[in-house]
A protein has these predicted regions:
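Nucleotidyltransferase catalytic core that binds NTPs
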Residues: 1-283
Length: 283
């Protein structure tokens, strides 16, 4: 049975403690740098592609870099982020927790989702650095304690939006890509080379992962299937399917939407940043 942190969507910030049960606290190679992958997004709902992206990134890191993955986290955007199809954070955290329940290394951190206000991606990554590298002191290695590299994990549309003028504040891009970096999974229809051409100063800290098996599942398509009363089984984890059906999520009536009219309220930008860049991750 996988270690668990008992994360539930009805937690409050007063109840919050950082989930670390599945974070590996020691690596055996003195030459490797511990890596923690962070996926920030809507996850409305989480799909098998979201989970698969973590596995692809871990393989890429093992075969192509000096990093060694010691943990990975899903961080759901909070309810202050208004978007079509976004159900309450409580539901999204619960679905993510169900999706990773049997994993030995994937975790859900509800910290971002528990905030009433919108949090920029940079603040979320700072939170992980504080908890893992400052409060916990990194991880043990044969060469002594090392800080973990905290890196963003996302689809290629993230880099595309970062290279599009007016979507992100240049200061946010600089802060994220200089201090953390990103593991980016290629997606059909995204010209990754064109997107990277405007981010040349940061390319040493951007790791592009090729999808060897093309997977086009998206949260948007899952919601569409639900509205059309079509099956979503084998596109999302079975416990998530059951949860969606039990709570009548993504039905035609738009149950549990964070938007009062069911149409969203725009992209809910934080100062200088559009969370729309990563919110569907992908979908």
């Amino acid at each position: 049975m996988a270690a668990a942190d008992n994360i539930t969507g009805d937690m409050t910030l007063a109840d919050y403690t950082f989930p670390h049960a599945r974070l590996r606290r020691r690596i055996t190679s003195p030459d490797r740098t511990p890596l923690v992958l962070i996926a920030c997004g809507s996850f409305s709902p989480i799909t098998f592609l979201h989970l698969r992206m973590f596995a692809m990134a871990a393989d890429y890191a093992r075969f192509n870099t000096e990093f060694e993955v010691v943990g990975a986290y899903l961080s759901c955007v909070g309810d202050a982020y208004k978007k079509t199809g976004l159900v309450k954070a409580e539901h999204r955290v619960n679905m993510c927790s169900l999706a990773v329940a049997q994993s030995s290394w994937l975790s859900v951190d509800p910290w971002e989702a528990l905030h009433e206000e919108y949090l920029e991606t940079a603040k979320v990554l700072d939170h992980f650095h504080q908890e893992i590298n400052v409060e916990m002191g990194g991880v043990e290695t044969p060469a002594g304690r090392k800080q973990c590299k905290i890196a963003l994990l996302a689809g290629a549309d993230l880099i595309q939006t970062m290279s599009t003028p007016g979507v992100w504040d240049p200061k946010d891009i600089d802060y994220i890509l200089k201090n953390f970096g990103a593991f980016i999974v290629e997606r059909t229809g995204t010209d990754i080379d064109e997107a990277l051409s405007t981010l040349q100063p940061y390319t040493p800290n951007i790791f592009v992962i090729q999808q060897l098996v093309q997977n086009d599942i998206s949260s948007t398509k899952i919601r569409l299937f639900r509205r059309r009363d079509m099956s979503i089984r084998y596109l999302v984890p079975e416990p998530v399917v059951n949860y969606i059906e039990e709570h009548s999520l993504y039905d035609e009536d738009g149950a549990a939407s964070t938007s009062s009219d069911g149409k969203g309220g725009g992209k809910g930008k934080g100062p200088g940043e559009s969370k729309g860049a990563t919110s569907e991750f992908p979908g």
